[in-house]
Amino acid sequence: MMLTKSVVISRPAVRPVSTRRAVVVRASGQPAVDLNKKVQDAVKEAEDACAKGTSADCAVAWDTVEELSAAVSHKKDAVKADVTLTDPLEAFCKDAPDADECRVYED
């Protein structure tokens, strides 16, 4: 006779309760680098390059201006699309993070 071992589960496995607190990270919305200043500097450099240098140097300098201008435009679009910067509740929670409306719950 062959003996078989049967497994009896008396209670389902229970996940331990996590003691971690929920952390909410919000972007400040402030650029780390002032892109407008960089664009202005690049325009001055491009004008100087066109006045003094070859057409290739001039083209490269204006390409740099174009890239920086595009970065400024993309940054503005991202700020407009960022809910944390335009939502009044987010502004309220920044000033009063302990308010009931600002609590964050984990599942």
From Swiss-Prot:
Single Gene Ontology MF annotation: copper ion binding
InterPro entries (UniProt xref): CP12-like, CP12_dom
Top-level taxonomic group: Eukaryota
Post-translational modification as stated in the protein's UniProt record: Contains two disulfide bonds; only the oxidized protein, with two disulfide bonds, is active in complex formation.
Subcellular location: Plastid, Chloroplast
Pfam families membership: CP12
Transit peptide: 1-27
GO terms for cellular component: chloroplast; protein-containing complex; supramolecular complex
Disulphides: 50-58, 93-102
Keywords: Calvin cycle, Chloroplast, Copper, Disulfide bond, Nickel, Plastid, Transit peptide
Biological processes, Gene Ontology terms: negative regulation of reductive pentose-phosphate cycle; positive regulation of protein-containing complex assembly; reductive pentose-phosphate cycle
Functional description taken from the UniProt entry: Acts as a linker essential in the assembly of a core complex of PRK/GAPDH. Coordinates the reversible inactivation of chloroplast enzymes GAPDH and PRK during darkness in photosynthetic tissues.
Record text on subunit structure and interactions: Monomer. Component of a complex that contains two dimers of PRK, two tetramers of GAPDH and CP12. CP12 associates with GAPDH, causing its conformation to change. This GAPDH/CP12 complex binds PRK to form a half-complex (one unit). This unit probably dimerizes due partially to interactions between the enzymes of each unit.
Miscellaneous comment: Binds copper and nickel ions. Copper ions catalyze the oxidation of reduced thiol groups and thus promote formation of the disulfide bonds required for linker activity.
Family to which this protein belongs: Belongs to the CP12 family.
Protein known as: Calvin cycle protein CP12, chloroplastic
Organism: Chlamydomonas reinhardtii (Chlamydomonas smithii)
